[in-house]
Regions:
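S-adenosylmethionine/decaboxylated-SAM
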Residues: 3-19, 24-66, 77, 82-195
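N-terminal pre-P-loop "Q-motif" helix
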Residues: 67-72
Length: 195
């Protein structure tokens, strides 16, 4: 390879990495120190809590934290580099940030043969089933309005980043009803964040 081509590829890689680093900082709210809104604990921005996904950002699109997004990026890039067949899905998306990030990674790498599936009730969390899952006893997460994000709001979040396109597919409903019927042929990456 000639030096000019290598230099051009290095520059492209730097731009790709800077774009994805910026997306990660924006999607977590770290870039603008988005305060927390959880009904427990302090609502001040705490970089340690945000890094580890231990708070509920007030406006950021994901609450999974910087470390989990970095892991999701590494896994998605591995799927691309290793030519793993299949699509990507997250089950339980809140505001859609992790899915937006997966779509951004596909975009940054010019991948057009994979879809990002966005699966959620888009109504919040279901009430706990203590008969089937005794650990649900006392859980009141289904009562928190902060966790109920509509399908239209999630679509708007994709749209705001210029990433709402035909490669983004939505699966609406409670997982026990919606996922068995979802028209997904094959998955390369599955991120489970459902309750």
């Amino acid at each position: 390879m000639n030096a000019e081509l290598v230099g051009s590829q290095d520059k492209l890689m730097r731009v790709r990495n800077e774009y994805l680093d910026l997306m990660q900082a924006f999607l977590t709210g770290s870039i603008y120190r988005d305060f927390a809104q959880a009904p427990f604990g302090s609502n001040l921005f705490d970089s340690h809590r945000r890094e580890h996904g231990l708070d509920w950002p007030s406006t950021a699109e994901t609450m999974i934290g910087v470390k989990r997004l970095a892991n999701l990026r590494a896994l998605t890039e591995s799927v691309i580099a290793d030519n793993v067949p299949g699509d990507l899905i997250e089950t339980g998306v809140w505001r859609g940030g992790a899915c937006i990030f997966m779509r951004a990674i596909l975009y940054a790498n010019s991948v057009s043969d994979k879809s990002v599936w966005v699966a959620d009730s888009f109504e919040g969390l279901p009430a706990g089933n203590t008969l089937q899952y005794p650990a649900d006893a006392g859980s009141d997460f289904h009562t928190y309005s902060q966790l109920a994000v509509s399908l239209e709001e999630v679509k708007e979040n994709f749209r705001a980043h210029g990433l709402l396109d035909a490669q983004v597919k939505f699966v609406k409903g409670w997982f026990k009803d919606s996922l068995p019927k979802a028209p997904i042929d094959r998955l390369a990456l599955l991120r489970l964040d459902g309750d």
